[in-house]
Amino acid sequence: MFPDQLSLPKEDSVMTQGAILDGIGSRIGLTFDELFERYNSMVFGLAYHILGDREEALDVAQEVFLAIYRKMGTFRGESSLKTWIYRIAVRRAANRFRWWNRLRRRGTVSLEEHLSKNPERELARDYTSKAQSPEDALLRQEEREEVKRMLNELPLQQRVAVIMRDIDGLSYEEIAESLNVSLGTVKSRIARGREVLKHHLNGQ
């Protein structure tokens, strides 16, 4: 489920939201509305798993689609549309993550403190079905929190690769293309990240 708060970019442009995208629409036959509907959950999910905060992920997702809107003419079809969008999303989310880390190093608020002081901003509540029992809902929330905690233990590059492979289900080739790194680098990052997660799961 994708949050309702994310909306299409509002920019002054000769291209309306229903118009075919220059450079993208001409190749794949999608309007911007259709592209947004197809990829918004993917972009938000990636940003959320990297950042761990609903509002931050919403902000990043807005930035991503605004960037797509502005850069639509640069898409040449040399990669798949999905990996092109992933590349933009990873870059934006990673930049936001590094920004939080810089604040932490300066002695200002950390992302972890921000989350703990704003629990109502967690996405977990949006994924909890009203049909669930309170016990099941609590268990699912605890499981999500544990996954998020373990992912937060990974270095950023490993975290991104593991998320793209094990959560989003991308192939190694798609990840390599999205991150603009070699296939061997992708496999190494995922293997190392999984090893760290395995140690955490085993309580080591």
Region roles according to the model:
Residues 45, 59-66, 79-91:
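Structural recognition of an alpha-helix C-terminal capping motif at a helix-to-coil junction
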Residues 77, 97-101, 154, 159, ...:
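Short, Lys/Arg-enriched C-terminal cap helix and immediately downstream tail that follows
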Residues 38-41, 49-52, 163-173:
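Short helix-capping/turn signature of helix-turn-helix
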Residues 116-149:
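Acidic, proline/glycine-rich intrinsically disordered inter-domain spacer in sigma factors
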Residues 74-76, 90-119:
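Arg/Lys-rich amphipathic alpha helix in sigma70-family domain 2
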